[in-house]
């Protein structure tokens, strides 16, 4: 089954409607690649421990735990970007609720960790919300 793009007249002048999915994919891939640079040692420790139960989750966060969640977050962003692209091709615009969730996640994260990438979530969420409008 082939997905046809929506009628061009309904999305005239809305170039951003085609950018949300690819930008999410780009941020997700960047996240995964950055995980390899920032967490090379902890990821190596996870691999050398045999993977099974290699990440301790106790009262204190470990480097292995941070590496795991940082990498998983990147993969989830890639998945979200793929879903956004497919939905944009099929429906022509995005539903607003995931955009609001991205803004909320970014805001909460930026409050807790102001020097972080959580600001990117707010930007992507705002773009998503813009792309949800008719």
Q: What are the residue ranges of the model-derived segments?
A:
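Short, Lys/Arg-rich, polar N-terminal cytosolic tail immediately upstream
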Residues: 1-14
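N-terminal signal-anchor transmembrane alpha helix
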Residues: 18-40
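Residues within membrane-spanning alpha-helices of integral membrane proteins
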Residues: 21-28, 74, 99, 106
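Structural signature of transmembrane alpha-helix termini at the membrane-water interface
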Residues: 33-40, 79-89, 107, 111-114, ...
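A cytosolic-side transmembrane-helix exit/cap motif
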Residues: 39-46, 64-65
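Juxtamembrane membrane-water interface segments that cap and precede transmembrane helices
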Residues: 50-65
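Mid-chain, well-packed structural core segment of small domains
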Residues: 67-102
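Hydrophobic alpha-helical transmembrane segments of integral membrane proteins
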Residues: 97-130
């Amino acid at each position: 089954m082939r997905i046809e793009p929506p009628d061009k007249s309904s999305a005239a002048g809305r170039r951003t409607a085609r950018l949300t999915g690819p930008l999410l994919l780009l941020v997700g891939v960047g996240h995964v690649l950055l995980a390899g640079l920032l967490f090379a040692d902890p990821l190596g420790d996870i691999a050398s421990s045999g993977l099974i139960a290699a990440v301790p989750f106790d009262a204190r966060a470990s480097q292995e735990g941070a590496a795991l969640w940082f990498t998983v977050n990147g993969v989830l962003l890639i998945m979200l970007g793929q879903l956004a692209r497919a939905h944009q091709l099929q429906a022509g615009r995005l539903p607003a609720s995931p955009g609001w969730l991205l803004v909320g996640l970014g805001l909460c994260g930026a409050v807790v960790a102001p020097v972080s990438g959580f600001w990117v979530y707010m930007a992507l969420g705002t773009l998503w919300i813009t792309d949800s409008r008719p």
